[in-house]
Amino acid sequence: SATALELFHNFALIHDDIEDSSEMRRGSQTLHRIHGIPLAINAGDALHGIVHQVLLENHEKLGAQKALQVHQHLNLVMQKTFEGQALDIGWVEKEVFPNREQYQQMIVRKTGWYSGRGPCQCGALIAGKEGELFESLGDFGESLGIGFQIRDDILNLTESSESSAPEAQVGGYGKEQGGDFAEGKRTLITIEMLERLNPEEQNRLQSILLKARTEVKEEEIVWAVEQSERCGALDAARSEAQNHAQRASSELSKMPQGSPRKILEGLLGFLAEDRKV
């Protein structure tokens, strides 16, 4: 089950990088940059097929009924993730700037399900836990996943470049510091910025986000990163990440003591670290 979840994760990232025209992933060039879009799409499709094969083989360890439950739940996770991705891509394609409520609907589906709720609830199904504990694990995972995503968005603006190689750069900048601006990402940070900047600054930020990635200049990224700190958008995002950590902690407190809870506490501890990111 864990293998299937990780294979799905990698399949989704391959396609996500193509859809976002991303240049870098985990410090290296994205698959489609190395092998081209057609082969990368095919690799993602192949992983998708392997996911279901792995889940079908689950009956040998879990029994037919439990294996079917896990398979059905992971299918739901995929569906929710694709719904969230459709919202995210649609905003960029249609030049839409979402409000906070719309962003929440997207992030719950795109990130909350596949990175948190889905894995936690799959574990609950395997352990034969249903009812209140099943829901609490899902709520814990959702808050944890969204919190991690917000921290990742913050790190995108505060961390130094992953690579200074020419091939990692697009429009003078790549998927390094501020890469989300180059890709036109609609994140919690951009929503906060558009609420806090003056009209002239709002127009400039929107014009950057609407540009093709290859047209975004380095000085525009530098300006946007500086404004995110100056206007308080980064601090607001840090606060929201902490709110999600607190929600996750509240759900975790409902779970029985033991080694599984300690593992989850370790994940939560990283998210709840009171440090600037």
Task: State the predicted function of each range.
Residues 197-253:
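Mobile late-domain/C-terminal helix-loop "cap" segments
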Residues 176-180, 235, 255:
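Short, contiguous acidic/charged loop-to-helix segments that flank catalytic cores in large enzymes
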Residues 77, 143, 211-215, 230, ...:
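A short structural micro-motif
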Residues 1-202, 243, 265, 269:
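Mg2+-dependent prenyl diphosphate-binding active-site environment of isoprenoid biosynthetic enzymes
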Residues 242-244, 249-277:
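Short, amphipathic C-terminal "tail helix"
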Residues 60, 195, 210, 253-257, ...:
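Alpha-solenoid HEAT/Armadillo repeat architecture
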Residues 8, 61, 215, 231, ...:
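Residues at alpha-helix boundaries and the short loops/turns that link adjacent helices
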